[in-house]
């Protein structure tokens, strides 16, 4: 599935992302288990709150980490998350 740069994104309502002290990292909890996230994935998914799209996520991360040219990597991660059902697009009517 191809991600549109201006489509708002949110974490799937079937999942919950939280800090897991035992693993010392963020995880996604789902009914059948848990997915451990690295720091980068967690930073990206935290911005999937229904208020941000690909463009604004990239902008915020570039400012936060004083980085540039990260759009292809962020897009790849978000498309993978979308295809795995971790996030969903919010369609504005």
UniProtKB/Swiss-Prot annotation:
Quote the Pfam families the UniProt record gives.
PqqD (PF05402)
Task: Write out the pathway annotation from the protein's UniProt entry.
Answer: Cofactor biosynthesis; pyrroloquinoline quinone biosynthesis
Drop me one GO molecular function for this one: quinone binding
The alphabetized UniProt keywords are: PQQ biosynthesis
GO terms under biological process: pyrroloquinoline quinone biosynthetic process
Q: Which InterPro entries match?
A: PQQD, PqqD_bac, PqqD_sf
Tell me which domain of life the UniProt entry assigns to the organism this sequence originates from: Bacteria
Q: Which NCBIfam families match?
A: PQQ_PqqD, PRK02079.1
What's the subunit arrangement here?
A: Monomer. Interacts with PqqE.
* Family indicated by similarity: Belongs to the PqqD family.
General function of this protein = Functions as a PqqA binding protein and presents PqqA to PqqE, in the pyrroloquinoline quinone (PQQ) biosynthetic pathway.
Name of this chain's protein:
PqqA binding protein
The organism's taxonomy opens as:
Bacteria, Pseudomonadati, Pseudomonadota, Gammaproteobacteria, Methylococcales
- The gene behind this protein is pqqD
């Amino acid at each position: 599935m191809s991600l549109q740069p201006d489509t708002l994104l949110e974490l799937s309502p079937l999942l919950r992302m939280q800090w897991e002290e035992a693993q010392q990292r963020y995880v996604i909890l789902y009914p059948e288990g848990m997915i451990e996230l690295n720091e980068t994935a967690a930073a990206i998914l935290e911005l999937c709150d229904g208020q941000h799209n690909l463009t604004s996520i990239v902008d915020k991360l570039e400012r936060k980490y004083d980085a540039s040219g990260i759009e292809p990597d962020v897009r790849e991660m978000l498309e993978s998350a979308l295809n795995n059902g971790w996030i969903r697009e919010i369609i504005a009517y």
